[in-house]
Each structure stands twice: as C-alpha cells, then as structure tokens.
C-alpha cells in the first residue's frame, strides 16, 4: 500500500509528486483498511482509475539529481514492449511539462537537447537530433504553458481484438515530418511521410 498511488479520475493523471496520497496514507486518513479504500475508488470510478506503482521507492530528489548528470539520457524506453500493462509513450511530454515547467529539474533548452540530439548520439543516429541544414528533423510546435500528458486508457485495436494502453497529450499545435504536417492541433492529418530507421549503433 505504501508504494501504490491512485492517478485520480480527471483528464490529467495525478502522479502524486508530493508523495501525500499513497494507498497507505489514504487508508490511514480515512480510518479504513487499504483494500477497502482501493475497492471504494474502483467502484467510484467504474473501474477507470489507474494506480501508479512506485517501484523505485519514490525518492524523487535523488532521481532528479541523477537526471542532471551529464551522461543521463532520460528518454530511451521500450514503449511498445508492455502496452497491455502500461505505456510510457508520454515520457517526452511528461519531461517537458513536469520536469521543466513544474519541478525545474531542467531548463527547457536542456530538456529538448537531452531528448533529441543526446538521444540520437547514444543510439548512433546520424544527422538527426538537431535542426541543421541537410539533417533529418521532425519538428514539434508546442504551446509550452498548456503542454500536458493525458490520462491513459485501454483500447482493443490490435489484431484478434488484442488490447493496449494509449495516452494522448495536449499542447502540441503541430508536428512536421519531412516537410509535411502530420499532426495539427492534436489530430493526425493522415500524412505518413516518415520511414523506419535501420542505421544505428548496434554495439
């Protein structure tokens, strides 16, 4: 119960960054058994509310210190490997909204650098990660003050009715790939000019 944190029932997930609303803390304040609180919240949300498991203990000050280290690259993930259990595809949005705007872990330019050029360098992606003449760049136009990750939800759109979690974001005014707008005001335009990257460092 000490590591389980409800993500709320609104449009934006509550990650309880202040560490004040674990299942254990909620149960203690309400004078109830943690299981009772858990079931009550599931009933209230009609099963929609998700819970965040703080597997690494929640010592956020230590994590912020690690993330400021020069060799830390925060955005390399396996977003597609566990989509039936959780999704971390919103990690770049969370980093820009939470770690720059609210927590001050990074400045905005530093955050952008770490999730673009620094990530490209680690993966060995050539001529990517920066806006330079002759380089390949995908460009996001963002409304920084309103940039926010959405609440994850489950859909069954895989072959044979397979399911996955997806999460949407707010604050993206447009995304341009290969000179084409593929997203405008959060909606896909139908354009798919991108290609699969096959050349990268393998050792």
Locate predicted features.
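Acidic/polar loop patches that form or flank catalytic/metal-binding clefts of enzymes
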Residues: 34-37, 107-109, 183-184
């Amino acid at each position: 119960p000490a590591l389980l944190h409800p993500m709320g029932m609104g449009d934006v997930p509550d990650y309880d960054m202040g560490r004040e609303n674990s299942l254990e803390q909620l149960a203690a304040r309400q004078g109830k058994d943690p299981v009772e609180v858990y079931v009550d919240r599931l009933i209230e949300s009609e099963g929609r509310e998700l819970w965040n498991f703080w597997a690494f203990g929640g010592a956020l000050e230590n994590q912020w210190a690690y993330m400021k280290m020069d060799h830390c690259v925060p955005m390399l993930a396996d977003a597609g490997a566990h989509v039936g259990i959780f999704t971390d595809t919103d990690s770049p949005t969370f980093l820009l909204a939470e770690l720059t705007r609210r927590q001050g872990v990074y400045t905005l330019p530093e955050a952008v650098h770490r999730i673009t050029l620094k990530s490209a360098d680690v993966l060995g992606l050539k001529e990517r990660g920066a806006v330079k003449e002759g380089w390949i760049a995908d460009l996001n136009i963002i409304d920084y003050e309103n940039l926010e990750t959405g609440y994850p939800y489950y859909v069954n759109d895989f072959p044979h009715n397979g399911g996955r979690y997806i999460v949407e974001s707010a604050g993206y005014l447009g995304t341009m790939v290969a000179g084409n707008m593929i997203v405008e005001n959060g909606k896909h335009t139908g354009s798919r000019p991108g290609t699969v990257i096959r050349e990268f460092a393998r050792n």
